[in-house]
Amino acid sequence: MAGYFFSLPAITQLTIPQQAAVGEPQQIALSGGPGTGKSVVSLWRHIRNYQSNPIKRSLLLTYTTTLKMYLADCCKTVRNEDFPDAGNLSSKNVGTSLKNSYKIHNTRFTEVIIDEAQDLSNDYYDGIVSPVSYGADDSQILYPDHCSHQAELKSLFPNNISHILDKNFRNTQRIMKFVKQAFPNANIPMSIIEGLSGNVGEWPVMQISYGNKYERSNENQDNAIESIINTLRADDHNIAVLVPWKKDAQYFENVLKNKNIDNSIYYEDDSRFPLGAKEIQNVHITTFKSAKGLEFDTVIIPNFNIIERTPIYIQREELMTEEYLTSMKKTIDRLVCLQKDHDILLSETERPDGLIDVTYRKLMCSWEDVFVACTRPRSNLYLISNYDLPYLNTVTEKVIL
């Protein structure tokens, strides 16, 4: 099984705005949409701290363990004749935001760089003892219960120098045209799409399986996933199967196992992954939320018709009362249940066995989750839907399975 193919651009390959952010002597407030290079800039800023002076003790933090692993491994690929240990030293000081909360409130670093800063509450930043640089994007807020909008971050760090990245380096033009059509609330500027004129690419492929929308999958969909992977997989080609929930990830893990396709998998589960993601292979299954910050050559999203059902809120399985489960089975268009102090909102009728995901806190699948998933691919985006989505016909290539 081949590992995830890492490709960190050389610092000389960064654009002038990106290099300016890396080299800014003061702390920075970095912003920009998906694919504009926020994580790359944060990573290079962290590495350069060690290249210029290894005793600086820079600390780079991000929200998910998968992205933390990716960034740490990218550090190891950097070679510098003047400071040969800079890559390894910087790699050792990449961590996740939540697990390093105590450290940054009690240990002083020359600089703490927080990637995906919008995923942390305002309280998280109170009392950090080191200078803070950060990157954030309001359109990628996936945890509205504990987040910080860019305006709030600006108030928290008023002296940080703003650096705005406005060119997409990840996606093709046709993928971004699709994203703009599918997610009007994302407010994607036309300048982003026009800037991709040199990387037109192929239209996302919409495969219609005509399966039961209440079932996790069907034979047509499973076979389509197998065919896509077997056609495209290569040692230097990264493929992801992205899904909303843990149980979906587990299901497709079994599908690939039965089809003899090696893969890695990650979802938030303290029992199975007590230390977070263990590895990333070049065929990887994960949830929308855990995919944020990562990029793949090819992304496959099964059951894409979920886009029409967002937002979906669910609670821990053990908190579900019999009264709630009974009400869930009723055929109604919209259901709002109050369970103890928590609201549960379903955008349309759902069977509880298809939605309940055992977790330690309330889960949500919003349009932002699906938006993040659709902006992960560099080249190919495959969307498999149980039924036709005509409003996307002009920005997809349709295939009937």
Summary of predicted features, one role per range:
Residues 2-77, 106-111, 116-264, 270-372, ...:
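Conserved helicase motor core of SF1/SF2 NTP-dependent helicases
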Residues 72-84, 88:
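Conserved NTP-binding/hydrolysis module of P-loop NTPases
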Residues 84-104:
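Short glycine-rich substrate-engagement loop in P-loop NTPases that contacts/grips substrate
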